[in-house]
């Protein structure tokens, strides 16, 4: 199965298998259901892991995955009214590709402020924040437009 970028996943892929890779933004537990917010360079998506439909070994490993770790998820796209995008990925298989250091030196979730000197020291993490990344995407498009003019 070929990898899909998150921005390529649409409602048209409902009930279709997809393979996505990205950084873990957040993991929430709600009883026998785990929600993973997965982010790649294009967008983010909610992934759902049900205890009943997943190997116990994989399900028990998910809450231990640290923020900003890189994972690979295979699953089916399902329509969902609760998901921000109107659909989510139901996890069928999960593989941790790279564990992140814990605790992270800076908060990438934008829930708290980090001093500029610390952000510059860990610029590689700071650039993963959607707000900062969008600045560089806009800047790139402007430079590209000017150079093509």
Model-derived features: positions:
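Class II aminoacyl-tRNA synthetase catalytic cores and aaRS-like
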Residues: 1-149
């Amino acid at each position: 199965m070929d990898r899909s970028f998150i921005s390529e996943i649409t409602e048209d892929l409902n009930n279709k298998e997809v393979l996505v890779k990205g950084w873990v933004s957040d993991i929430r537990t709600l009883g026998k259901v785990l929600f993973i917010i997965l982010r790649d360079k294009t967008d983010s998506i909610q992934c759902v892991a049900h205890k009943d439909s997943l190997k116990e070994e994989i399900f028990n490993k998910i809450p231990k995955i640290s923020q900003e770790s890189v994972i690979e998820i295979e699953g089916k796209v399902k329509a969902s009214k609760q998901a921000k995008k109107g659909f989510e990925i139901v996890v069928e298989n999960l593989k941790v590709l790279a564990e992140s250091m814990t605790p992270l030196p800076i908060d990438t979730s934008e829930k708290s402020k980090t001093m500029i000197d610390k952000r510059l020291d860990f610029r590689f993490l700071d650039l993963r924040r959607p707000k900062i990344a969008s600045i560089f995407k806009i800047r790139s498009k402007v430079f590209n437009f000017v150079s093509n003019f």
